[in-house]
Amino acid sequence: MKFSTQKPKKTLHMVSLGCTKNLVDSEVMLGRLSDYQLTDDAQNADVIIVNTCGFIDSAKQESINTILSLHEDRKNESVLVMAGCLSERYKEELQKELPEIDVFTGVGDYDRIDELVNEKRSNFTSEVFLASETNERVITGSSYHAYVKLSEGCNQACSFCAIPSFKGKLHSRTLQSLVKEVKALVAKGYVDFSFVSQDSSSFLRDLDIKNGLELLVEEVEKIEGIKTARILYLYPSTTTLSLIDKIADSKVFVNYFDMPLQHITPSMLKIMKRGKGVEQLNELMNHMKSKPNSFVRTTFIAGHPGETEDDFEALCNYVENFKFDRANVFSYSDEEGTTAETRTDKVEQELIDERAEVLGEIISQTTQESLESEVGKTFEVYIDGESEEHEYLLSARKTIWAPSIDGEIYINDNELSEGEQIKFGQIYTVKITELVGDKLLATVIK
């Protein structure tokens, strides 16, 4: 009798917290650890990696709670790794306060994670890692959609944001590098792309090219096999009317405009160091909204130091009148090393939370109106697979929407009228029949 001499694969449990930019780095780590078997069973995993977020207080707390919870239940001989932004930002403090963790690393060693795990060694490379076409990634969560990172770092000086302090200045990839990566992903079957960075509209400005995103749109359009693409995280002062036109004229890029505004009054934009004045901002936003089938998403901060009742009221009125398709609101929190932290005109925490709640309710209403406007319409969707809600429903996403954040459409058929089975990851035309809560229901036409 022959017995197999092959050793069972070691297992890896990965938790990626925070933004989609973090997710790209997590996928690079998975690529470096491809000889491990991915598992949802954290308790018995040989290696556990948490790619942390250090953006705001709630994200920091989530990162700490997640890693301590995983430590509590893990097996003795496993390796627990803390990576990413929080680890980078507080490297000295965390290494002293969390002896439970075996390996600490920040934002510079994603492509060396296999070495650090094997050697059970912490390391903080001073240069921020930027994924390129040479990094083999394991794309997660989709068989047809991938995020592609344009750049790292940021040259803006927003009063409330500490990201440049640990991610550094803007560092763009070359256009050639991006094109190579996208072509390689298309060859693997990916057809839908979301381009991300801290400040996407500044792409290539560090290389003295001011219209980097327009060039990106032109080059991506030439790649055969791409069905749809979108750009996330535009910045007001580096977004131009010509860029909006370029996206709107594209046959590949959908009219998806994601621009965090943070506020709208002249005084608050000045305090927050947010570039363009209100008139130019309104011109940009109205230009986006004027495009056919446009989808406009943004974020706001409530309770930033210096925000008066008049400022907040003006912000609420603006959000109510503009009617964003989607928006988020964050409660202001002090971040070490920022100019906002040192201001003396702080808003009381109770009032910050109250304002965030009020603005959140307005946003919920405008989002609901956006969803209600879809009922009766016919449009194209990607069908992702079976819904988690019910085994007889399929989960779909409007092709213009970004994955995970913009909503979910339930399809109540699993085959076409000719009896042909619906294929996951494909585009179908559907008609929206009703809205139940915040979920759209649809039937497949073709």
Swiss-Prot record:
Keyword presence, Transferase: yes
Cofactor: [4Fe-4S] cluster
Keywords, ordered alphabetically: 4Fe-4S, Cytoplasm, Iron, Iron-sulfur, Metal-binding, S-adenosyl-L-methionine, Transferase
GO molecular function: 4 iron, 4 sulfur cluster binding; aspartic acid methylthiotransferase activity; metal ion binding; protein methylthiotransferase activity
Cofactor detail note: Binds 2 [4Fe-4S] clusters. One cluster is coordinated with 3 cysteines and an exchangeable S-adenosyl-L-methionine.
Binding site for [4Fe-4S] cluster 1: C19, C53, C85
Catalytic activity: L-aspartate(89)-[ribosomal protein uS12]-hydrogen + (sulfur carrier)-SH + AH2 + 2 S-adenosyl-L-methionine = 3-methylsulfanyl-L-aspartate(89)-[ribosomal protein uS12]-hydrogen + (sulfur carrier)-H + 5'-deoxyadenosine + L-methionine + A + S-adenosyl-L-homocysteine + 2 H(+)
Location relative to the cell: Cytoplasm
UniProt entry tagged with the keyword Chloroplast: no
InterPro entries per UniProt: Elp3/MiaA/NifB-like_rSAM, Methylthiotransferase, Methylthiotransferase_CS, Methylthiotransferase_N, Methylthiotransferase_N_sf, NA-bd_OB-fold, Ribosomal_uS12_MeSTrfase_RimO, rSAM
Residue ranges of every copy of the MTTase N-terminal domain listed in the record: 10-122
Xref: NCBIfam families: 30S ribosomal protein S12 methylthiotransferase RimO, MiaB/RimO family radical SAM methylthiotransferase
Family membership noted in the UniProt record: Belongs to the methylthiotransferase family. RimO subfamily.
Name listed for the protein in its UniProt record: Ribosomal protein uS12 methylthiotransferase RimO
Organism: Aliarcobacter butzleri (strain RM4018) (Arcobacter butzleri)
